[in-house]
Swiss-Prot record:
Its EC number is 2.7.11.1. It is found in: Host cytoplasm; Host nucleus. Belongs to the protein kinase superfamily. Ser/Thr protein kinase family. This is Serine/threonine-protein kinase US3 homolog. Keywords: ATP-binding, Host cytoplasm, Host nucleus, Host-virus interaction, Inhibition of host adaptive immune response by virus, Inhibition of host MHC class I molecule presentation by virus, Kinase, Modulation of host cell apoptosis by virus, Modulation of host chromatin by virus, Nucleotide-binding, Serine/threonine-protein kinase, Transferase, Viral immunoevasion. It catalyses: L-seryl-[protein] + ATP = O-phospho-L-seryl-[protein] + ADP + H(+); L-threonyl-[protein] + ATP = O-phospho-L-threonyl-[protein] + ADP + H(+). CDD domains: PKc. The lineage of its organism: Viruses, Duplodnaviria, Heunggongvirae, Peploviricota, Herviviricetes. Phosphorylated by ORF47; this phosphorylation regulates subsequent phosphorylation of proteins 24 and 27 by ORF66. Autophosphorylated. It comes from Varicella-zoster virus (strain Dumas) (HHV-3).
Amino acid sequence: MNDVDATDTFVGQGKFRGAISTSPSHIMQTCGFIQQMFPVEMSPGIESEDDPNYDVNMDIQSFNIFDGVHETEAEASVALCAEARVGINKAGFVILKTFTPGAEGFAFACMDSKTCEHVVIKAGQRQGTATEATVLRALTHPSVVQLKGTFTYNKMTCLILPRYRTDLYCYLAAKRNLPICDILAIQRSVLRALQYLHNNSIIHRDIKSENIFINHPGDVCVGDFGAACFPVDINANRYYGWAGTIATNSPELLARDPYGPAVDIWSAGIVLFEMATGQNSLFERDGLDGNCDSERQIKLIIRRSGTHPNEFPINPTSNLRRQYIGLAKRSSRKPGSRPLWTNLYELPIDLEYLICKMLSFDARHRPSAEVLLNHSVFQTLPDPYPNPMEVGD
């Protein structure tokens, strides 16, 4: 399967899970389509070959991302995209493809005109782009996307990043039923990335399949650090602001409670569920794009899990406890038992156990990435994990 096939798969389904920036004033956010799009074949998205007939304005209009927005704002965004393209060309890169605009700016598949190396360049004026550059400069780990370099053009910050074959969102669409060993290999890479980040006082805050990049199950990395929070005290929960994606956010983050690295564990649990079942987010509202409000999302989690009152945070000042515990009083499920949603899926017992632990309603009961990696299911995997097949074959 080629690059376009994977993208078309998800555009056709109309599944859009928008990330929420900590500064919700960007034009993309007012339009409801706010995806970070930096590796090849990011999903869901559109792409266009960089040829003499390519028209950024027509590209954006055809995707209707500016419906209901004043025309001058659309024109301003088109102008910024054009400015980014000029800056990239002046920096010595040939633009091969233009990806769908994201919350923080624009992304392009490029080739270094001197070395012929294929890369992805993210260009943006917003804080998230600068935040990502700051975070990535300090990180070196095989499961974390590596920053190759940065440059500026006028007021734009541009990140030079490696180009991966696809993201996990598209990969799951192409593969459908992954072997358990591949699922565990991918999840191991994600958990290793989280262990590394948390040990370095960083919370990602937007772990989801769209932000996990893959060449094959043994070559996987976590990227898109525009929502990252740092430095944090990994031993004490605090409220660092609201960010991420509603469909994959943890209950405490949705409730605006103090939080810590456990928010990433919840989101990684959603990713594991998606790999194990081939379904979109367990707590994504049917018929919607995931951009519903936080209150409805929390209610959905409680209802589908059958959350028991004893599974709520014990802190009496917790927003989650104060505002939502009443919804759980009719639950007949025993606290600590299998959540109700497990009755809908036939999951291998080890995968179900991991998912349930990672999706513990009370963040105190979610294992750390280090603890999860010590589970026996990961110990039997080859390390490094071999490439069983080419992505898209």
